[in-house]
């Protein structure tokens, strides 16, 4: 685990900056903290195997590093951010675990099925599925949101989750865990992120429903609801002036770092949460989710 003192978590203002979607970690200022130097494992996932979508950067990278240091092998699913993915894989292998990189489009059911098969081929088992990849875009007016944009957001954020769970669940043993990344937007939607926020509400509902649907198989399903977290999504989807003050409206007065969520994903994947399923766990810097 990391301590707060170990994590680099600067308060705003951040420098105004903007990137093309989906963004690159190496171009962010300040650099995000994924727990590279702070996360210390304790063997809580020893011998496990995980799939992490969006594992190339941001929260996904922090989770991959933490899982590896807790003893898990990791398949890192990503779209086309090859440099970021290679860097995440480097941290996993430095922890002494296997890292498998698979690029492709999770909007396609066949690719989601391939991810599960690749994990089973590489690791011989699948214990943890982290549905973390997301598409986000900000719009000033409702009329600016195209039907294509709405469809892409739902196919990336929601449809892929269904495809992956459907492919993975029959191959997972009792005691396995599924962890979905929702958002504070599930309960407190940002109007300029209408499509994204709507999908995050759907993910919270999907999590609660699926948890009940497959409880008799001994597989737990939970979700994490991050608040403002400093990831490549921010400078690549928000205007520069919004980036500058990002996270300043939380009671803690700053954005969270990806490393500050990793421990929650570890807890939900491990036996520490053996009586938790269907939960939505907020990590929001003090912003309430009631």
Task: Give residue ranges: language-model regions.
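Short, flexible catalytic-loop segment of classical short-chain dehydrogenase/reductase
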Residues: 204, 225-236
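Short C-terminal tail/terminal secondary-structure segment
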Residues: 6-15, 28, 36-37, 139, ...
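Short, small/polar-rich loop/turn modules that mediate ligand/substrate recognition or access, typified
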Residues: 215, 220, 276-278
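Conserved mid-core segment of classical short-chain dehydrogenase/reductases
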Residues: 13, 108, 113, 121, ...
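Active-site helix of classical SDR
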Residues: 165, 199, 207
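Residue(s) in the substrate-gating loop at a strand-loop-helix junction
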Residues: 183
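Catalytic Tyr-X3-Lys loop
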Residues: 143-162, 179, 203, 252
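The beta1-alpha1 cofactor-binding region of Rossmann-like NAD(H)/NADP(H)-dependent oxidoreductases
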Residues: 82, 103-116, 147, 259-260
């Amino acid at each position: 685990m990391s301590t707060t003192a170990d994590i680099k978590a600067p308060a705003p203002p951040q420098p105004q900056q903007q990137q093309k979607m989906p963004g690159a970690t190496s171009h962010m200022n300040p650099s995000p903290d994924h727990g590279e130097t702070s996360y210390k494992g304790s063997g809580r996932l020893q011998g496990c195997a995980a799939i992490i979508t969006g594992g190339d950067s941001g929260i996904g990278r922090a989770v991959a590093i933490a899982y590896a240091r807790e003893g898990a092998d990791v398949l890192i699913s990503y779209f086309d951010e090859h440099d970021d993915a290679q860097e995440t894989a480097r941290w996993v292998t430095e922890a002494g675990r296997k890292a498998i990189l698979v690029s492709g489009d999770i909007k396609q059911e066949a690719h989601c099925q391939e991810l599960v098969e690749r994990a089973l081929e590489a690791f011989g088992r699948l214990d943890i599925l982290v549905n973390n990849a997301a598409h986000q875009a900000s719009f000033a007016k409702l009329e600016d949101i195209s039907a294509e944009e709405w469809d892409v957001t739902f196919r990336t954020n929601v449809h892929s989750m269904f495809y992956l769970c459907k492919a993975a669940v029959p191959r997972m043993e009792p005691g396995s865990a599924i962890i979905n990344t929702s958002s504070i937007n599930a309960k407190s939607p940002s109007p300029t992120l209408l499509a994204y926020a709507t999908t995050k509400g759907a993910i919270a509902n999907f999590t609660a429903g699926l948890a009940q649907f497959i409880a008799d198989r001994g597989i737990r399903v939970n979700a994490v609801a991050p608040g403002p977290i400093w990831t490549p999504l921010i400078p690549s989807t928000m205007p520069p002036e919004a980036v500058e003050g990002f996270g300043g409206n939380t009671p803690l007065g700053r954005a969270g770092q990806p490393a500050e969520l990793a421990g929650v994903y570890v807890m939900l994947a491990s036996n520490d949460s053996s009586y938790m399923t269907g939960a939505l766990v907020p990590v929001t810097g003090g912003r309430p989710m009631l």
